[in-house]
Each structure stands twice: as structure tokens, then as C-alpha cells.
């Protein structure tokens, strides 16, 4: 079937959600962020890629080696 990826991504929020749509605010909350300069390390998957596409102007994404 499909190969599972062990790739991890560090997601850092660098812009505030003030003035953003409800969908973008909810996506930031689902990612576990909430304020500028908060970071999370999450496993890469298609769901995460879709969420990042919604808030690409608010976050920075870096690949992390384990």
C-alpha cells in the first residue's frame, strides 16, 4: 500500500491570528499553536500537509532529523 513516513516537521507560528478567518484560527488551534513563536514537532502526513496549506502565511515549517 503506502509507505509510512517517519519524517518529522517543526512548525513555528510566527504571525498572530488576529484578523484571520475562523477556519484559520481553528487550524492553528488543532496544530497545538496559539501565539507567535510557539513551536510543535509533528509527524508528517497528508492531514498535516492540508492543515499547513490553510495557514501557510502564519507558520514556518522545518524538517527535523531524529
From Swiss-Prot:
Keywords: Ribonucleoprotein, Ribosomal protein. Part of the 50S ribosomal subunit. InterPro entries: Ribo_uL30_ferredoxin-like_sf, Ribosomal_uL30_bac-type, Ribosomal_uL30_ferredoxin-like. The keyword Ribonucleoprotein applies. The keyword Ribosomal protein applies. It comes from Chloroherpeton thalassium (strain ATCC 35110 / GB-78). One of its GO terms (molecular function) is structural constituent of ribosome. This is Large ribosomal subunit protein uL30. Belongs to the universal ribosomal protein uL30 family. GO terms for biological process: translation. Pfam families: Ribosomal_L30 (PF00327). One of its GO terms (cellular component) is cytosolic large ribosomal subunit.
Amino acid at each position: 500500500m503506502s509507505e509510512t513516513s517517519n519524517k518529522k516537521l517543526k512548525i513555528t507560528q510566527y504571525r498572530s491570528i488576529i484578523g484571520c478567518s475562523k477556519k484559520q484560527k481553528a487550524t492553528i488551534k488543532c496544530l497545538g499553536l496559539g501565539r507567535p513563536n510557539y513551536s510543535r514537532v509533528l509527524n508528517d502526513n497528508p492531514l498535516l500537509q492540508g492543515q499547513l496549506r490553510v495557514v501557510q502565511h502564519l507558520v514556518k515549517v522545518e524538517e527535523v532529523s531524529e
